[in-house]
From Swiss-Prot:
Belongs to the SelA family. One of its GO terms (biological process) is selenocysteine incorporation. It comes from Pseudomonas aeruginosa (strain UCBPP-PA14). Keywords: Cytoplasm, Protein biosynthesis, Pyridoxal phosphate, Selenium, Transferase. One of its GO terms (cellular component) is cytoplasm. Pathway: Aminoacyl-tRNA biosynthesis; selenocysteinyl-tRNA(Sec) biosynthesis; selenocysteinyl-tRNA(Sec) from L-seryl-tRNA(Sec) (bacterial route): step 1/1. It catalyses: L-seryl-tRNA(Sec) + selenophosphate + H(+) = L-selenocysteinyl-tRNA(Sec) + phosphate. It holds the Pfam family Se-cys_synth_N. Its EC number is 2.9.1.1. This is L-seryl-tRNA(Sec) selenium transferase. Its cofactor is pyridoxal 5'-phosphate. GO terms for molecular function: L-seryl-tRNA(Sec) selenium transferase activity. It is found in: Cytoplasm. Converts seryl-tRNA(Sec) to selenocysteinyl-tRNA(Sec) required for selenoprotein biosynthesis.
């Protein structure tokens, strides 16, 4: 095959085929992409490895368009979370209700009274946007909000216990994720760790014996992401508060996930509520906004008015504060808690957590035939009972009864690993990536969080073509 001549960049830029790309991506991006493309084709064209049709304006514009689309595609993508873990940290945790999404849109589009008191016409406090709701729902005297619960714990410790000792049970020196360890956070906050008791048993006398002139606070951490069972003992919040107050010290309680309602009402495991911690005497309570609360990422610090005032004056508060979008979403979510009778209908996270297993199984029965057809004869598709998790460190032992589509390759065991990896990759490569979990030589798709059946079904033909 003889060599062919490449069209010039200028000719391609002025071609009708490239006009839509110019309009969508701009001249500079299109020019750079065309230059790169022609540079790659120059050597093959010189050696006759390309046909004339491959260098037509339409074909080259099409290839440039594919590259530009890939370059400009958003890195933030919607996915189907079919892992069985509802509050999946890697997949975004809590899904916001419609009310919060509308509030975010409003706050993003228009000016708003973020730090402006409409009554007085003077500068306001952004925490006031949710302070009234928090007081109403929890009975807390005051509140401040930062960007996550790790920040809440850090700020509270630094404000109340810097250069002093923080007394905490050895069994509560938890690690969450790969970088949040209570001893490390205390050190960063300038608080000297004074651990008492043992891993499995801590008594009131341990705290009493530890208190001295260097003591700054007592701390209690809810061990939400693991469970110690058997021969155990711990000091209840009310008793710990009495010990702290008897020595003029504050009690800081970190609830981690945190909830404002008794989850057993919806058949979920018991989790300590913010109201209970405050009623039992905790002076400061911290918890997350994007876990069991079902809101945006945030760290809420509630409690004693004087102590919250000290926390708000800490220079770190400005570095850790939340923006208008977070506050708008948080206010909307908190507002839903005013009507607990309809909370499971309106709060997306609670609705998904409390979804009946029978309803999920019926959905699996509907979807199994279509998925089986897309996968072909090389796969067995079975509807099975499944056990999901709340996630994000909440109730690690508890399981949520669910149903899943279990996808198992009809191949010898030694070949199943590759087949499963190929299927996982194909599912992740769909327009709406599907994320499941591997277990027992099969890929499980837990349907607890599958809200959009039509979108899931619409891309099954694409899956079949990817696997063929």
């Amino acid at each position: 095959m003889s060599s062919v001549r490449l069209p010039s960049v200028d000719r391609l830029l002025r071609s009708a085929a490239a006009a839509p790309l110019h309009q969508r991506y701009g001249r500079e991006a299109l020019l750079a992409t065309l230059r790169d493309l022609l540079d790659e084709l120059r050597e093959p064209a010189r050696h006759g490895a390309l046909a004339e049709i491959e260098l037509s304006e339409a074909v080259l514009a099409g290839r440039a368009g594919e590259r530009l689309a890939a370059q400009h595609a958003s890195r933030v993508r919607r996915v189907f979370n079919l892992t069985g873990t509802v509050l999946h940290t890697n997949l975004g945790r809590a899904l916001l209700p419609d009310e919060a999404i509308e509030a975010i849109t409003l706050a993003a589009r228009y000016p708003l009274n973020l730090e402006f008191d409409l009554a007085s016409g003077k500068r306001g406090d952004r925490d006031d946007l949710i302070a009234g709701l928090i007081r109403e729902l929890t009975g807390a005297e005051a509140v401040t909000v930062v960007n996550n619960n790790a920040a809440a714990v850090l700020l509270a410790l630094n404000s109340l216990g810097a250069r002093k000792e923080g007394i905490i049970s050895r069994g509560e020196l938890i690690e969450i994720g790969g970088a949040f360890r209570i001893p490390d956070i205390m050190a960063r906050a300038g608080v000297r760790l004074h651990e008492v008791g043992t891993t499995n048993r801590t008594h009131a006398r341990d705290y009493e014996a530890a208190i001295g002139p260097r003591s700054g606070l007592l701390m209690r951490v809810h061990t939400s992401n693991y469970s110690v069972q058997g021969f155990t003992a711990s000091v209840p919040t009310a008793q710990l508060a009495a010990i702290a107050h008897g020595h003029g010290l504050p009690l800081l309680e970190d609830l981690g996930s945190g909830t404002l309602v008794d989850l057993t009402r919806w058949g979920l495991p018991k989790e300590p509520t913010v109201q209970e911690a405050l009623a039992d005497g905790a002076d400061i309570v911290t918890f997350s906004g994007d876990k069991l609360l079902g809101g945006p990422q945030a760290g809420l610090i509630l409690g004693n008015r004087e102590l919250i005032g000290r926390i708000k004056k800490n220079p770190l508060k400005r570095a850790l504060r939340v923006d208008k979008l977070t506050l708008a979403a948080l206010e909307a979510v908190l507002g839903l808690y005013r009507d607990p009778d309809r909370l499971a209908e309106r709060l997306t996270t609670l609705r998904l957590l409390s979804r009946p297993a029978a309803e999920i199984r019926a959905q699996a029965e509907r979807l199994a035939p279509a998925l089986g057809e897309a996968l072909g004869e090389g796969w067995e598709v079975a509807v099975v009972d499944a056990l999901g998790m709340i996630g994000s460190g909440a109730q690690p032992v508890a399981r949520l009864a669910s149903a899943a589509l279990c996808l198992r390759p009809r191949q010898p065991r030694r070949l199943r690993g590759r087949a499963l990896r190929n299927l996982e990759e194909a599912l992740r490569g769909l327009p709406l990536p599907v994320i499941g979990r591997l277990d027992d030589d099969a890929l499980w798709l837990d349907l607890r969080q599958l809200d959009d059946e039509p979108a899931f079904l619409a891309q099954l033909p694409r899956l079949r073509s990817e696997l063929s």
